[in-house]
Design a protein with these regions (language model features):
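Flexible nucleotide-interacting loop at or near the entrance of a catalytic core
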Residues: 56-119
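Conserved post-Walker A coupling segment in P-loop NTPases
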Residues: 52, 89, 103-168, 179-195
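The feature encodes the CheY-like receiver
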Residues: 4, 28, 32, 194-195
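Short amphipathic alpha-helix used as the core "switch/output" element in two-component signaling
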Residues: 2-4, 9-21, 38
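A Lys-centered signature of the CheY-like receiver
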Residues: 42, 50, 93
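Conserved AAA+/SF3 P-loop NTPase catalytic/coupling segment centered on the Walker-B
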Residues: 152-157, 178-207, 224, 228, ...
Length: 255
């Protein structure tokens, strides 16, 4: 790879600036390991030194084309998801629904924790997905968990993960939903069913952006947005002592 008036690494940078997903195969007579490493760091898909034997180049080209095809397919599917979960696709024309959609549209442009309250079957998860796919985190994962669907003993380990040997049957370490949602959004459905101990741990995570897996002592940093939902009036739950007041006010920050 020889480019007049421009170094090969600068040339690679220019290509990646024009199309970050375009796979680039560098074919060169330079067998320097340092140059190969630098080229890969700048985004080269493969680095082939001349003279090469057999089908090494054609194999690299086939792999590059497959990667390009997957990247294009992923981009298409993501656009389909974003289009499907556009706020305009949520059915409803009552003043209350329109007000909710306007608020959801506003909050999607922020990174605030969100609490969605509504009866069963009113589309709370659909609103949560629309918020995610219209936010700056849409390129990250959207992970969901129904707090009412798991026993209390399992919910904590499912959310925060655990280390090997943390409890009977924990024969390997496992990431929790918070870690899996890192860089994206975690949707906590039916949060009213979460016990006070787990609520306290969620509160700490929201404030410190870190967690410890069950049975572990290592602190894990997480960057995750939390969207909560419930078909119960959490304000009433707080008054009755059935939900932690500090956790409620930390998740109910918008509007």
């Amino acid at each position: 790879l020889r480019v007049p008036k421009m170094g090969r690494l600068e040339f690679l940078k220019r290509i990646k600036t024009m199309d970050s997903e375009l796979p680039v195969i560098v074919v060169t007579g330079d067998d320097s390991i340092e140059t190969a490493v630098e080229s890969m760091k700048e985004g080269a898909f493969d680095y082939i030194v001349r003279p090469f034997e057999g089908e090494s180049l054609s194999v690299a080209v086939v792999k590059a084309l497959k990667m390009r095809s997957l990247a294009m397919e992923n981009r298409y599917l993501r656009k389909e998801l974003e289009s499907h979960y556009n706020f305009g696709n949520i059915i409803g024309n009552s003043p209350k629904i329109l007000e909710v959609l306007l608020l959801a549209g506003d909050v999607s442009r922020t990174d605030s924790t969100v609490f969605v309250y509504g009866e069963s079957g009113t589309g709370k998860e659909l609103v949560a997905r629309a918020i995610h796919f219209n936010s700056l985190r849409k390129g990250g994962p959207l992970v969901s968990i129904n707090c009412a669907a798991l026993p209390e003993t399992l919910l904590e380990s499912e959310l925060f993960g655990y280390e090997k040997g943390a409890f009977t049957g924990a024969d390997r370490s496992k990431k929790g939903r918070f870690e899996l949602a890192n860089g994206g959004t975690l949707f906590l459905d039916e949060i009213s069913e979460m016990n006070p101990i787990v609520q306290a741990k969620v509160l700490r995570l929201i404030e410190a952006r870190e967690l410890e897996r069950l049975g572990g002592s290592e602190t894990v940093k997480v960057d995750v947005r939390i969207i909560c939902a419930s078909n119960k009036n959490l304000e009433d739950y707080v008054k009755k002592g059935q939900f932690r007041e500090d956790t409620y006010y930390r998740i109910n920050v918008f509007p």
